[in-house]
Amino acid sequence: MILYGFAIFLIVIALLPLTQGTHWIIRGWDFIRVQTCFLQALILVLLAFFEFPVDEWQYVVAISLLAAFIFQLYVVFPYTHYYPLRDSKPEDPDSLRQISLLSSNVLQTNEEYAKLIEQVNLHNPDLLLVMETDKNWENGLKELEQEYPTVVRVPLDNFYGMHLYSKYELAETQVNYLVEKDVPSIFTKVYYGSDKPLELICVHPAPPSPTENETSEERDAELLIVGKAVRELNPDHPIIVCGDLNDVVWSRVSRLFAKITGLIDPRIGRGLFPTFHADYWYLRFPIDHLFHSKNVVVNRMERLQNIGSDHYPMFFTFWLENGEKVEKPEIDSETSEEVEERIDEGLERAE
């Protein structure tokens, strides 16, 4: 009977994120779909060998558990090596400019600055985005400014500071507080040698959790405001949105973000690349992201070594296809209404 009770629990938590509920107790189950897939498979095996269904209700539970397991496999399958890549290598990559980006949530209380500097020196990214940075981290990374003459500094001691280091010229840089007054984002144009700059947006919204926001409404609103901003950018320009989004790529809002922007998640066909929590291998999920427009092609995507943070850094190299115009995706009225409703709810809650 204990197995059937656990089976019912696993069915419920697989379905809860499909509801419109935004409380962290509901949204949190979306993060661990991979882990619950393994638990569902284990319970199915145990039922088959040790407590095979006899009564009608037991058959209903067992079949429902199997259906929930198949559903979760369907959700996470695109983020495996067995799924086709969304982008492919350009026909003539040598004619295109290739640049690189390293993104890392460093954990504000982490003082192992040298570990991040070591990774930066090893991979030599053109762009370096670090999050949860305060004045101590700014000072700890001071030596990098010799190689990165352009720096956007937003030091904060609330675990939402952000610094962007660039080897290239940045223009029209804005530090925005889109939803919450103490959670910044960076919007900038990267001039990497082409007359058409790379549009770069760096974000780190607060998650739904028992220690932070009670619901996902603020996070959802920020991601969708960014999504609307992406739609207003020049379609000739390559676009990248990156950072610790505090959301998994298969969530309703992440998929809604991809739908309204047309941006591509390079995890599709490459793997999960779980980045958090670095200290617990059995409880990791992918929440550090990079989304890119169709005129950007990812060449390399790698999770780097632990730097003492609770997040692993991510490293990307990508080709920029100059001059290729990308059409904005059409969105229906129902999608548009959902986007506006979620934004309004998040802004209202953040007041």
Placement of each model-derived feature along the sequence:
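Short acidic/polar active-site loop segments enriched in Thr and Asp
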Residues: 126
